[in-house]
A protein has these predicted regions:
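Extended, highly charged
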Residues: 1-252, 257-267, 271-280
Length: 280
């Protein structure tokens, strides 16, 4: 595969070492990662989730620099350029989107390989997924960990950034907040979602600019039925709402190794789960 052809998340994931042994979402993914020095891994046989796959340690700076033929400094400069030059993604019809190849008949987020990494954690967490929210002509795209509290119920840790503002504003108006939860988006989307801005910038437009700069091709998105736009080639696209309810979230071992406290945080209700064939 040529560098210009390596665009989707699965293009990168399938370049990893493949683990074919049955691996459990309950501590098994983390144990296997540790045993492999936290190198890039693709798990092809998830005990609790037949037909679904999982990956870890894929999109490192070293990997992206190699695939994109950029030095670390050039990668930072490219990201800075995209911030300064956001552009619109291209909207395509849902039937042309890989993420719409399958829709769960009954929503059950426990049937996809969401891991329980550390024994101290409250349970299974989506910690590498992106939330996209749209309200009153504004959009936010950012990372937030989400505790799996039921088949269609999550509790999200919302720190005081822009998605928290969107949520508080919707609640002040006695409204729900329409969102999408994305797993396995391409690196341009994930990098943009990880950026931090003081002002309420549309990170999806930054992702579109980065995608055009890196690949020379526009970022394709679709519009879900709740009005939220998502990357067309994402592995999973969940249509959801942030409700007016709060519930317990945590404890959780965060990126620093510190066990984060229990807090009351917003509840997310998942209404639909779309995914690619043999999703990662």
């Amino acid at each position: 595969m040529q560098p210009e052809e390596i665009m989707s998340f699965r293009d990168h994931a399938t370049m990893s070492s493949i683990v074919n042994e049955s691996t459990s979402v309950n501590h098994g993914l983390m144990h296997s990662s540790a045993n492999n020095q936290h190198s890039a891994i693709l798990f092809d046989n998830i005990t609790e989730c037949p037909g679904h796959r999982a990956s870890m340690n894929i999109l490192t700076r070293e990997h992206l620099c190699k695939v994109w033929s950029l030095s670390p400094g050039e990668l930072i400069d490219t990201m800075g350029w995209a911030m300064d030059n956001p552009c619109d993604p291209v909207i395509v019809e849902p039937e042309k989107a890989e993420c719409m190849q399958n829709t769960m008949a009954i929503v059950d987020v426990t049937s996809i390989p969401v891991p329980w990494h550390y024994e101290q954690d409250r349970g299974r967490y989506m910690s590498a997924s992106v939330i996209i929210a749209e309200r009153n002509g504004e959009r936010n795209m950012s990372f937030h960990r989400q505790f799996v509290a039921g088949k269609n119920r999550l509790v999200a840790r919302l720190v005081p950034r822009h998605l928290r503002q969107f949520t508080d504003e919707a609640r002040a108006d006695n409204e729900i907040l329409n969102i999408a939860i994305i797993n396995g988006a391409d690196p341009c989307v994930l990098l943009a979602a990880a950026m931090s801005f003081n002002e309420r910038i549309d990170e999806l437009r930054v992702a579109a600019s980065l995608h055009l700069k890196v690949y020379g091709k526009p970022l394709r998105v679709i519009r879900l039925s709740n009005g939220v736009h998502v990357p067309a080639d994402a592995e999973y696209a969940m249509q959801a709402v942030i409700t007016g309810e709060d519930d317990e979230e945590g404890p959780y071992v965060d990126i620093t190794g510190t066990v984060d406290d229990i807090r009351h945080q917003p509840v997310i209700q998942i209404n639909q789960i779309h995914h690619r064939n043999s999703p990662i």
